[in-house]
């Protein structure tokens, strides 16, 4: 892909991600996405022939960003802090991408290739960070990544259905993290 085409692709993904977050995956205008990206609608359709293709690309891009964040955190930092930082990133992803995820599942089904690939990226990242945190004694040994991901989805659902408290997700995640720490013997 030419350099200008790559830049346009990246700008379209960024604009679409913002529009889907603000307006919902079904209601965001493709013309508005193209305008925000600073390209014509024809450029949008050359990269993404359908709304579904754009949805898939945005979802995959966001999952890859979570994986990249996990890789950064695995390479540096204290294991417990790295684990908590990534869970906060996962809460943000889950909270802002709920309509996108719902649209993907409704259109493709939860077992589609793109959903499976993205779920695997997220779960593999969670497994790696969790194992490192458990080895360091920062997280209880009986915790698994499936439960963690479900807890995060629960936090995002609560914050979606009870808006108006911007600190709620962080407080809930702090409670979860406190519960994940090993308890003193006694």
List the predicted regions and their residue ranges.
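Short alpha-helical scaffolding segments that buttress acidic/His motifs in well-ordered protein cores
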Residues: 87-90, 152-155, 176
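Basic, helix-initiating cap at the start of DNA-binding domains
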Residues: 1-23, 27-36, 53-56
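Base-recognition residues in the alpha-helical recognition helix of bacterial helix-turn-helix
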Residues: 21, 46-49, 61
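Hydrophobic/aromatic residues within well-ordered alpha-helical segments
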Residues: 8, 58, 62, 66, ...
């Amino acid at each position: 892909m030419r350099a200008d085409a790559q830049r346009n692709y990246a700008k379209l993904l960024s604009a679409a991600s913002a529009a889907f977050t603000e307006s919902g995956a079904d209601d965001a205008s493709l013309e508005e996405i193209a305008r925000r990206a600073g390209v014509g609608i024809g450029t949008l359709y050359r990269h993404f022939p359908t709304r579904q293709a754009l949805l898939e690309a945005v979802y995959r891009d966001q999952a890859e960003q979570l994986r990249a964040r996990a890789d950064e955190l695995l390479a540096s930092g204290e294991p417990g802090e790295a684990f908590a930082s990534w869970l906060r990133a996962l809460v943000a992803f889950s909270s802002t991408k709920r309509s996108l995820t719902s649209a993907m599942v409704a259109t493709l089904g939860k077992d589609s290739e793109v959903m499976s690939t993205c779920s695997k990226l997220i779960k593999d990242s969670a497994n790696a960070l969790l194992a490192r945190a458990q080895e360091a004694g920062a997280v209880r040994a009986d915790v698994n990544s499936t439960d963690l991901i479900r807890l995060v989805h629960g936090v995002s659902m609560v914050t979606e259905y009870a808006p108006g408290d911007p600190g709620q997700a962080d407080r809930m995640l702090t409670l979860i993290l406190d519960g994940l720490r090993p308890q003193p013997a006694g």
